[in-house]
């Protein structure tokens, strides 16, 4: 049995859910309050990406202590990105390392695949990848602060070189020649080369009592993509699940994922209408050049556009429609169905207006700066989408209703 801590996960929770469901391993989706009140059992706790701070707040002191007890008594903890950050010294304290700060915001805006050197001699690394280079995906990662002494921490992977689909903010890294990057640094003081590439640690592991943990700023749960090597992260995750959860050995890679093509098992009019309206918004944003395709499950976005929230809503609505409407889900959905319908109608109208206004502001930026005040756009954005890092807004209200149904 795998427990998945859901709080503050959004699209990263749905990505992990897709990976775990594909294996057939029994799982439970839990909130921090559930863990604090009823404890943990089973073999593994998996924590998806998202805000580590908000996950810690959801667990509270009692939930955090229960996670530590679970691992000390033989459980396994696997955390990706924000789930990795949660387990560091200033969080759960499973790993003695700390999170490294970033003074340059651009260094956080890195997404796509990186070539990573994998260690030799660790049972947690698949034999066919041990000591080799693998393509591992990162999606706006934090990073470990590596001390001079490892303090019982084993580095499993280090970043080495950019992969074929790497972006910095909304710019494909492959489109930026080295001489231009050097020129920008000299002329503007802007450094777009990710400092992660300076052989920083990507994934680490260690023990705690009778249990163990694996923390990765690479999202190993990322589905296979459309280029060679994109299956390697999933192969690593499946190896860990075989080792720690007894997954049968015949599964070698995670299946692809297209949220829009998930089967519809819950034919609810309100949910279906919401999906149709959201797809209309996404099409409008693409037409305006504010969103663009990244891969089969993710849309990229221009800087300043709330792409994370659009992606999370798409994942949430599509996944909810793919679930069976059992008694538990219906008992949660029925009392909030009308609330969701009304809130989504407000969101649709507001988001459509904001997307068009944002595009107009871009058009007027040179010829008539200030005609459409950026402060007003920011206020509207916060009301609809909240903070890019910490959520909120009308979109989070919708996500909270949908995430109860998982």
Where are the predicted features?
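A glycine-rich, often tryptophan-bearing local segment used as a flexible ligand/cofactor-contacting loop or short
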Residues: 53, 57-140
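A binding-site-centric feature that preferentially detects glycan-recognition modules on secreted/surface proteins
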Residues: 5-6, 15-16, 109, 114-115
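Catalytic beta-strand/loop cores that center a nucleophilic Ser/Cys/Thr
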Residues: 114-209, 217-221, 300
């Amino acid at each position: 049995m795998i427990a998945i801590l859901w709080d503050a996960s959004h699209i990263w929770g749905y990505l992990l859910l897709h990976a775990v469901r594909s294996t057939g391993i029994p799982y439970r989706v839990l909130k921090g309050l559930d863990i604090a009140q009823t404890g943990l059992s089973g073999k593994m706790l998996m924590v998806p990406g998202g805000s580590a701070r908000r996950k810690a707040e959801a667990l509270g002191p009692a939930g955090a202590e229960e996670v530590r007890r679970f691992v000390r008594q033989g459980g396994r903890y696997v955390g990706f990105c924000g789930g990795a950050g949660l387990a560091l010294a200033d969080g759960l304290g499973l790993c003695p390392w700390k999170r490294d700060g970033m003074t340059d915001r651009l260094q956080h805006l890195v997404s796509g695949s990186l070539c990573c050197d994998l260690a030799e001699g660790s049972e947690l690394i698949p034999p066919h990848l041990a000591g080799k280079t693998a393509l591992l995906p990162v999606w706006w990662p934090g990073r470990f602060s590596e001390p001079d002494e490892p303090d019982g921490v084993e580095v499993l992977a280090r970043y080495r070189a950019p992969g074929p689909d790497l972006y910095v903010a909304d710019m494909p890294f492959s489109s930026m020649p080295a001489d231009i990057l050097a020129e920008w640094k000299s002329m503007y003081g802007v450094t777009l080369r990710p400092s992660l590439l300076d052989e920083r640690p990507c994934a680490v592991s260690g023990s705690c009592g009778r249990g163990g943990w694996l923390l990765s700023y690479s999202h190993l749960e990322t589905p296979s993509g459309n280029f060679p090597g994109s299956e390697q992260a999933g192969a690593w995750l499946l190896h860990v699940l075989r080792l720690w959860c007894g997954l049968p050995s015949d599964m070698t890679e995670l299946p692809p994922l297209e949220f829009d093509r998930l089967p519809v098992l819950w034919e609810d009019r309100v949910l279906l209408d919401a999906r149709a309206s959201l797809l209309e918004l996404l099409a409008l944003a693409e037409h305006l050049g504010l969103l663009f395709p990244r891969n089969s499950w993710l849309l990229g976005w221009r800087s300043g556009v709330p792409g994370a929230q659009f992606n999370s809503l798409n994942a949430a609505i599509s996944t909810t429609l793919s679930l069976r409407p059992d008694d538990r889900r219906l008992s949660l959905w029925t009392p909030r169905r009308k609330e969701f319908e009304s809130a989504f109608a407000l969101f649709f109208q507001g988001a459509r207006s904001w997307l068009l206004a944002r595009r107009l502001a871009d058009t007027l930026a040179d010829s008539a700066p200030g005609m459409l005040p950026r402060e007003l756009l920011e206020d509207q954005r916060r009301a609809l989408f909240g903070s890019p890092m910490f959520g909120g807004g009308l979109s989070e209200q919708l996500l909270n209703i949908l995430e109860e149904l998982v």
